[in-house]
């Protein structure tokens, strides 16, 4: 099969690799019909994450058709159309029973990213996200082996197009969990730092949950314009405003700040010189600019929700300010499985339209170019979907939009 493989920072290529096969009795093999490039993939692409090896297959946002099942798979059969959570969970351990699937104790043979973990078990394995998280081949490929086939795969209704369902794999549940963690309710005020795919969908979720005043902070004008035009967010460009938190506070009741802030940036994917040195030492770091801004912008007693990925040290983390303001922090990888039953009806009813953030539909063969476009924000790129078998951008979009490919094997 063809897969996108890693060969060093900024060097990925589509090449032929062995087809995956069933290894455990509850595995399934999936034919990929749509796969996406995630913002967190850029950390891997840029060489910012330790234990990424030459030949590794990226990709944790994917869906497709079941083509083979292990003998113990009970919930699926060949031909089923499913979307796959990026978190691999066993469904039966202490944490899975708490619906904290990202903390599953039984799927990750790696050590995770915690620097001071002691004897605490590693978190769940993640598809295509380094050997820290299990070294499980990802879904930027024509086929993929999916472990725990009775637990993770989520059946997609026949009339729901791939581009509407695909982001149930990661960024829509991530956005939803971030908004829920922020305890957004009718009339809330919230500031979202980062207008990438997760940030934009977080704004959509916040609006649906009743947020009245939403600020969005970024420095890409086209993203800010989209957030303002589509979701009614108040845009702040930090290239033009050196202190967005101050501007936010000045526009809130009593100059108290917003009820909640959501950091959809995480450690900066571009990386400063300091961050690069720390990466080489296997101690990833972040300047912490976004997080400091979040702490400054939120009101006393407010909530800081962090869906953005962090690892290692945070430089200049103003813990004293957080203590003084009595802030609550909620963060971590997304417990995808817990949210799917809640989110699917919202998509079916048109209350959430995750596909609207997509700007680029591309043939899978052009995946390396897709990474370049997404990384450099060329062509006003917000989100890239890659489609195996498509021969052109038009064919790729046709294959995953509307009712095309809504049933295995063809068009309705």
Curated annotation (Swiss-Prot):
Cofactors required: Zn(2+)
EC number assigned by the record: 1.-.-.-
Q: List keywords of the entry alphabetically.
A: Metal-binding, Oxidoreductase, Zinc
Enumerate the residues binding Zn(2+) 2. Answer: 90, 93, 96, 104
Any note on cofactor binding? Binds 2 Zn(2+) ions per subunit.
Q: Which Pfam families match?
A: ADH_N, ADH_zinc_N
CDD domains given in the database record: FDH_like_1
Q: Where does Zn(2+) 1 bind?
A: 38, 60
Enzymatic class: oxidoreductase
What family name appears in the similarity comment? Belongs to the zinc-containing alcohol dehydrogenase family. Class-III subfamily.
What is the name of the protein in this document? Uncharacterized zinc-type alcohol dehydrogenase-like protein YbdR
Source organism per entry reads: Escherichia coli (strain K12)
Gene, per the UniProt record: ybdR
